[in-house]
C-alpha cells in the first residue's frame, strides 16, 4: 500500500462516518416534531407516541453492542447497510401508521436501525482507521458532524411537515435515509487500514465482562444514562410544549437545531478544556449547570 493510499483511507472513513452520523442524528432528533400531528391523527393522547419514542431510544441502546459485534465480524460497511435498511423500512411504516401497533413497531424498528448506522459502528470504524495520535480529533470531528446534522435537518424537517404534512414528509425522509447507503461503503476502507490490523481479538462477552469490572465505565454509563434521559425528554416534548404555548411550529424545530449547534461548540470547547483540566470536575460542572437549567 502506497503512502498516499494510507493517508487517503482514514480521510474516506471520516467523511463516510461524518455523513452517516449527520443524517442519522438529524433523523433521530426530529421525531419530537411528529408528536402532536401523529397523536392528533390517531386520536390518542400523547402518551402513546411518547412511549413509542422511549422504546425507540431503548432499542438504540440494546442494538448498539449487537451491531458493534456484527461490525467486528462482518465489517462496518455491511453492519451499517443493515441498519440503514431498517431505518428506511421504519420510516415507510411510520408514514402509513394506522394504530398503536404500527406506531410502536415503526419506532422500535427505527431505534434498532439507528443503532446500526450510529455511533457504535461509525466510531469503531473511524477508531480503527486512524493513527492513535489523531484518534481523539478524528472521533471529535465525526461526533460534531452528528450534532451539525441536528442543526440543519431538524428545522428542515419542520418545514417539510408544514408544507407537505407529516405523513408525506416521512415518505420523503425515507429517501433521504437511503443516501446513507452510499456513505456506508466508505466504512469498508477501515478494514484495509494498517491501524485495524493491530490489537488482540476479544469476544463480545469478554468485552462486556471487562467493561463492567471497571468503576470508571460504570460511572460513565450512569452519566450517559442521565444525559440520554435529558436529551431525549427535550427532543420529544419541546416541540409540543412550543405548540401548547401558541408559538409557530417552526420555533420548535429551530429550538432543537440550536441545541445541536451549541453541542458542536460545547464538544470542541470542553474537549479543549479536557486536555488541561480535570475531566471529572468538568463533567460535574456540566451536569450541575444542566440541573439548574431545568429548574429555571
Please annotate each region the language model reported.
Residues 29, 57-65, 150-151, 260-268:
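Residue-level signature of mid-helix packing/kink "hotspots" within the transmembrane helices
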Residues 31-35, 215-270:
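Extracytoplasmic gate region of multi-pass secondary transporters
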Residues 63-75, 267-278:
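Helix-to-loop junctions at the C-terminal end of transmembrane segments
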Residues 78-92, 281-295:
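Structural signature of the two symmetry-related core transmembrane helices
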Residues 90, 101-109:
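Paired small-residue
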Residues 108-144:
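Cytoplasmic helix-loop-helix junction between adjacent transmembrane helices
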Residues 142-190:
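Helix-loop-helix hairpin linking two adjacent transmembrane segments in secondary transporters
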Residues 188-206:
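Flexible cytoplasmic inter-helical loops of multi-pass small-molecule transporters
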